[in-house]
Amino acid sequence: MSDSAVATSASPVIAQAASGEKKVSTKKGSSTPESKKSTAAPPSHPPTQQMVDASIKNLKERGGSSLLAIKKYIGATYKCDAQKLAPFIKKYLKNAVANGNVIQTKGKGASGSFKLSASANKDAKPKASAVEKKTKKVNASAARATKSKSSTSTTKKAAGAADKKLSKSAAAKKNVEKKKADKEKAKDAKKTGTIKAKPTTAKAKSSATKPKTPKPKTTSAKPKKVVSATTPKKTAVKKPKAKTASATKK
């Protein structure tokens, strides 16, 4: 009886231990892929193609950029180990020369100097990395929040200033309209004054022309004087003839 009691009492302990081991094993198995996913950090630099194109473009060397200059530029700007990336850089340069995206001005293989072609210059704009994009998004959201706060205050100020400007502009418009109305009234008054003055000048002209009508009377009176002047001349000529005839008879 004692042996059976010990066996029965020990069995639940073994069962609990086995269940605990299973739970631990399941937890470990489930945690490993998640930990791998979480630890896989995004790359801190863009692809080698973009880095090489950007370095050649920004170095702006007339004879072309050498491999050492490209490595130095990549290490300084992107803060990565350029020596580890050297085989990838060489491979890209060879493929780019074969495709025509890069022109090799000196040397052979990856040891010479390189220039971007005309088509590659257009497409060589460096794209921001994923980390830079995230930081830009965070900064942009913070900037938007600050801008929204400042914009509300500025909109209130702008609204008050706009109301003041509107009131000032309305008053200025009223003054301008009043001035225009006064000018129009003055013009109308001048026009009416000139129109009223015109008939007086016409009347003066008519009164001045009326005395000219008696001129024909003076012309009719002049021939009468001429006729009276001619008759005495005829009598003066006839009288000497009569005197000569009486003298001959005597």
Swiss-Prot record:
Residues 140-161, 192-234 have a biased composition (Low complexity). InterPro entries: H1/H5, Histone_H1/H5_H15, WH-like_DNA-bd_sf, WH_DNA-bd_sf. This is Histone H1.1. GO terms for molecular function: double-stranded DNA binding; nucleosomal DNA binding; structural constituent of chromatin. GO terms for biological process: chromosome condensation; negative regulation of DNA recombination; nucleosome assembly. Residues 1-52, 104-250 are annotated as: Disordered. Pfam families: Linker_histone. The keyword Nucleus applies. Residues 44-118 form the H15 domain. Keywords: Chromosome, DNA-binding, Nucleus. It is found in: Nucleus; Chromosome. CDD domains: H15 (cd00073). Residues 1-11 have a biased composition (Polar residues). Residues 122-133, 174-191 have a biased composition (Basic and acidic residues). Residues 235-250 have a biased composition (Basic residues). Histones H1 are necessary for the condensation of nucleosome chains into higher-order structures. GO terms for cellular component: nucleosome; nucleus. Its main location: nucleus.
